[in-house]
Design a protein with these regions (language model features):
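Long, glycine/tryptophan/cysteine-rich extracytoplasmic
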Residues: 23-71, 129-145
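Short, Lys/Arg-rich, polar N-terminal cytosolic tail immediately upstream
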Residues: 1-2
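Loop-to-transmembrane alpha-helix initiation sites
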Residues: 145-154
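A structural signal for the beta-strand cores of small, secreted beta-rich domains
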Residues: 17-18, 53, 150
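Signature of small four-pass
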Residues: 5-26, 69-126, 154-172
Length: 174
């Protein structure tokens, strides 16, 4: 079991990469009201500019969205990028046979795990922050996109996987 723990940052890195791709490639906010359905793509919530897609019956509409980004989605995106770099460094350092670098790699993985946890939690609150930033009064028919929900879950799981070896090492010492 202990030999497998050194692969935890690598597993967390893979989960973080998938979460990063999902943020950019899937719908961030979805709207549904009877026959009318609409979506905002990932960059719309992250950067305030992107595409809005809609469908009414059989008619499809594509438009440009220019609004304000959700502050927590921007922070989650930044945390995810920092965690990706940190996990890449940590994954390399763990496999280097220098003891001091191995411990430092574990510390970097712990910090990256915390960033992934906070970023994943922030992603769940994108809809209220996006609605407040763009002054929407009613969000009853809006929902967080499925890809973003999966990205948030993967980020949280990656954070737990990344922090697990460091936490277990601390518990083992006591």
């Amino acid at each position: 079991m202990k030999k497998l723990l050194k692969f935890a940052p690598l597993c967390a890195l893979l989960l973080a990469i998938v979460a990063f791709i999902l943020l950019l490639a899937t719908h961030s906010i979805e709207y549904s009201n009877g026959n009318l359905k609409g979506w905002y793509d990932g960059p719309a919530a992250l950067f305030g500019k992107g595409q809005s897609l809609g469908a009414w019956g059989g008619l499809s509409v594509v438009g440009e969205f220019e609004g304000k980004a959700a502050w927590n989605a921007v922070l989650a995106f930044i945390f995810l990028i920092i965690a990706l770099v940190a996990l890449l460094i940590s994954s390399v350092m763990v496999f280097v046979k220098i003891k001091a670098l191995e411990k430092f790699g574990g510390l970097i993985a712990l910090v990256a795990g915390g960033l992934l946890l906070v970023g994943g939690i922030f992603l769940f609150f994108t809809l209220p922050a996006f609605a407040a930033a763009n002054e929407w009064n009613n969000t009853n028919n809006f929902a967080l996109g499925g890809g973003w929900v999966v990205a948030a879950i993967l980020a949280i799981l990656g954070g737990v996987a990344s922090a697990c070896p460091a936490v277990l090492a601390l518990v083992e010492k006591k």
